[in-house]
């Protein structure tokens, strides 16, 4: 009898380039924390259906956040399962792009929670 293993996601890996940009936004006071930004990225990724790709160059030190800090109740994982990290990276790319355009996190939240994508 084959024993079925339940694979748990414990860590959402983000690239060094994303981590540097998030640190810059945190220092400027645009975001409260990296964990918050990844949580917002996961929500945006799920709402838009966008998954992360190797958009930024990978390599160097690993950067990321603990999954429990992003999704303590497991709601995102219930919605998308093991793909939570890919949705988080996709949404994080959207969030970073919007912040680089000078938008506030409130504008970004309002735009994507209302379902607008333009």
Regions found by a protein language model. Name each.
Residues 2-9, 15-36, 40, 58-65, ...:
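Surface-exposed, Lys/Arg-rich phosphate-binding patches that contact polyanionic backbones
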